[in-house]
Regions:
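Bacterial Sec signal peptide processing site at the extreme N-terminus
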Residues: 17-36
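The feature marks short-to-medium sequence segments in extracytoplasmic or secretory-pathway proteins
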Residues: 65-106
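Short, solvent-exposed, Trp/other aromatic-anchored flexible loops in extracytoplasmic proteins
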Residues: 89-140
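Beta-strand secondary-structure signal
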Residues: 57-61, 74-76, 106-108, 123-125
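Hydrophobic beta-strand positions in extracellular immunoglobulin-like domains
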Residues: 62-64, 79, 111, 128
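Sec-dependent bacterial lipoprotein signal peptides
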Residues: 1-20
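Post-signal-peptide N-terminal segment of Sec-exported extracytoplasmic proteins
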Residues: 38-72, 132, 136
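Surface-exposed edge beta-strand/loop patches
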Residues: 28-31, 122-164
């Protein structure tokens, strides 16, 4: 009888432990709670925004998808109105400063005293040094603009070649 109780106890313990493992595995997406996403040739960016008494908070992840490693990363975010006038800006230096390919780093900025209105935009600017193999590092700048409320990318208009 005691042998049967031991077997049932071990079985119950294994079932409960495996359920914990499956539950933890299901929660491993680092961008699950970040509703806005942008993908470019060099970085993937995922973020969320929320208002506090200090202003507009932007928190997210920056993932290197192109280079063997990037370093000296500066991420700047600008709040623009519909006429592209800068209403607020902030910069951060994501840590760690060296991001290997397929690794990501968290970032956070506060656009102080910012209260976005309908039609406002966020412009993300990523300044970094990229290194591919043994060729040394090159400085790059990557940027994109999105609607503040939806995260939908706004393509910048390209002027006709005859316009100067």
């Amino acid at each position: 009888m005691s042998f049967l109780i031991k077997i049932i106890s071990i079985w119950a313990m294994l079932v409960s432990l495996s359920a914990c493992t499956l539950n933890e595995y299901a929660r491993q997406s680092p961008v699950a709670d970040l509703p806005y996403r942008h993908s470019d040739f060099d970085f993937k960016v995922a973020w969320k925004t929320y208002l506090t008494g200090q202003g507009l908070n932007i928190e997210g992840l920056l993932k290197n998808v192109r280079y063997a490693q990037v370093e000296s990363v500066t991420l700047s975010v600008f709040l623009l109105n519909s006429a592209n006038k800068v209403l607020a800006s902030a910069s951060t230096f994501p840590i760690p400063q060296t991001i290997k390919m397929d690794y990501y780093v968290p970032f956070g900025v506060i656009l102080k005293n910012a209260a976005p209105k309908k039609g406002d935009r966020l412009k993300f600017l990523i300044d970094y040094k990229a290194q591919e193999g043994n060729d040394g590092a090159s400085r790059w700048i990557s940027y994109f603009t999105v609607e503040e409320s939806t995260g939908i990318e706004i393509k910048e208009s390209i002027k006709h070649p005859d316009q100067w």
